[in-house]
């Protein structure tokens, strides 16, 4: 079997939705050695101060850092052992002929072209999906690709001389600087994968960091504590590929019973909520359930899948964009920590009604993304209202805030029961 291709940046964040999918197919134990648990964010201010912000209140509310390459290798090895599945590498699906239901393929090893009959076709060919683009000009999918004016480059902090971590290993490290940020995620070997997110152009953009002097000056000003830990800083910043950040949204994901878009081909999102992989794995869980219910009635299967998941994908796409602003900017505001403290207090008092939006997304696989977004908007307004004139949690009228939660948010079990009734 061919090795899984690396070449892509940004460590993956495995959360409840992804773990749920891996457990359902029985391979979570294979993935476990690759995982590094993270309890929260370590925010590094420009003046050297650090603040640790927990993701959740319970000890089991963790997010796991995992390298893309390691996870890909295990998933491909498992797939390779399935008797009726054949893996073909370096075969590029370059288009789709709807009337004939055939995929046009180019063999990248020799440039030869051939066709494959596909009835139906599950198209999981990425954000730049050629299958999806084959329908451009029609109303079949209505795909729209939107790029951020920001990009990213991968850097690294090696393990220390004794193989030790040079930063706390149980945190996602963020250095927020308003319009840009540097993040670091731990790997099992004691090293960290860093990702530098910057505007593509402008004063503090990749375009202006064009030589060693500009890179060194930039890091000395904005990331003075990180620069000494990155031995290949200039080489990596100047020579590593610049990654793009974008969102794919579609009006539809299927062409009757013929084609179904899956994963990034249907709903690529920016990485700032760590949910792209988790959303794709959730797709698999949902699709498996619907296929079990309807077997090979593909028009019904595809329509049901779209009806249940498309709005959720749009919701997490929005929340991921929101989280970019939070990570690079809002998290620096003392009010952010106060709102988080109030959210935790309300969750303690009313766990059946108030779950922070971040926790709903990351730790509650049974709460749809759309529900998390909708409840999160109500909660955000409530948190803003009760902290607007407060300087600490002691200044907040907690009883009044709890009463407001009861008035504005139905019990979360009511939502769960409604969803179960609709699916049955």
Identify the meaning behind each predicted range.
Residues 6-9, 205-210, 272-276:
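Short, solvent-exposed loop/turn segments at secondary-structure boundaries
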Residues 2, 130-131, 268-270:
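Catalytic P-loop NTPase motifs of RecA-like helicase/translocase cores
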Residues 86-88:
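General small-molecule cofactor/ligand-binding pocket signal
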Residues 77, 82, 91-95, 100-245, ...:
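Conserved FAD-binding catalytic core of PHBH/FMO-like flavoproteins
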Residues 289-424:
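C-terminal helical "tail/cap" subdomain of flavin- and related membrane-associated enzymes
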Residues 33-37, 223-238, 295-304, 313-318:
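Acidic/histidine metal-binding catalytic segments
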Residues 3, 7-78:
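Active-site-adjacent segment of FAD-dependent monooxygenases/related oxidoreductases
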Residues 122-123, 155, 241-332, 368, ...:
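Conserved mid-domain beta->alpha element of the FAD-binding
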């Amino acid at each position: 079997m061919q090795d899984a291709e690396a070449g892509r940046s940004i460590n993956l964040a495995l959360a409840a939705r992804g773990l749920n999918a891996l457990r359902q197919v029985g391979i979570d134990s294979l993935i476990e050695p690759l995982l590094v648990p993270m309890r929260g964010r370590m925010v590094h201010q420009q003046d050297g101060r650090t603040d640790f912000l927990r993701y959740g209140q319970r000890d089991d509310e963790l997010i796991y850092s995992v390298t893309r390459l390691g996870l890909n290798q295990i998933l491909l090895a498992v797939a390779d052992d399935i008797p009726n599945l054949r893996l073909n590498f370096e075969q590029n699906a370059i288009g789709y002929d709807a009337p004939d239901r055939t995929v046009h393929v180019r063999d990248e090893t020799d440039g030869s072209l051939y066709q494959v009959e596909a009835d139906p076709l599950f198209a999981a060919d990425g954000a730049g999906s050629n299958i999806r683009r084959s329908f451009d000009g029609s109303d079949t999918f209505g795909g729209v690709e939107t790029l951020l004016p920001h990009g990213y480059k991968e850097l690294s902090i090696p393990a220390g001389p004794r193989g030790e971590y040079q930063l706390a290993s149980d945190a996602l490290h963020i250095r927020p600087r308003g319009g840009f940020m540097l993040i670091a995620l731990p790997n099992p070997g004691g090293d960290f994968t860093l990702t530098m997110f910057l505007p593509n152009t402008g004063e503090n953009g990749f375009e202006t960091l064009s030589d060693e002097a500009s890179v060194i000056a930039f890091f000395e000003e904005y990331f003075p504590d990180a620069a000494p830990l990155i031995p290949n800083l200039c080489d990596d910043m100047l020579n590593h590929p610049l990654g793009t950040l974008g969102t794919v949204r579609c009006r539809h994901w299927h062409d009757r019973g013929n084609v179904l878009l899956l994963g990034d081909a249907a709903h690529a999102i920016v990485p700032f909520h760590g949910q792209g992989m988790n959303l794709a794995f959730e797709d698999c869980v949902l699709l498996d359930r619907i296929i079990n219910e309807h077997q090979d009635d593909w028009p019904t299967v595809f329509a049901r899948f779209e009806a249940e998941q498309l709005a959720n994908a749009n919701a997490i796409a929005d929340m991921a964009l929101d989280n970019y602003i939070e990570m690079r900017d809002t998290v620096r505001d003392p009010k952010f920590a106060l709102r988080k403290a109030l959210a935790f207090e309300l969750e303690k008092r009313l766990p059946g009604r108030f779950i922070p939006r971040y926790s709903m997304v990351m730790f509650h696989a049974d709460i749809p993304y759309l529900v998390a977004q909708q409840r999160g908007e109500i909660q955000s307004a409530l948190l803003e209202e009760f902290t607007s004139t407060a300087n600490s949690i002691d200044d907040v009228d907690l009883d009044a805030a709890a009463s407001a939660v009861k008035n504005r948010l139905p019990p979360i079990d009511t939502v769960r029961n409604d969803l179960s009734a609709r699916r049955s």
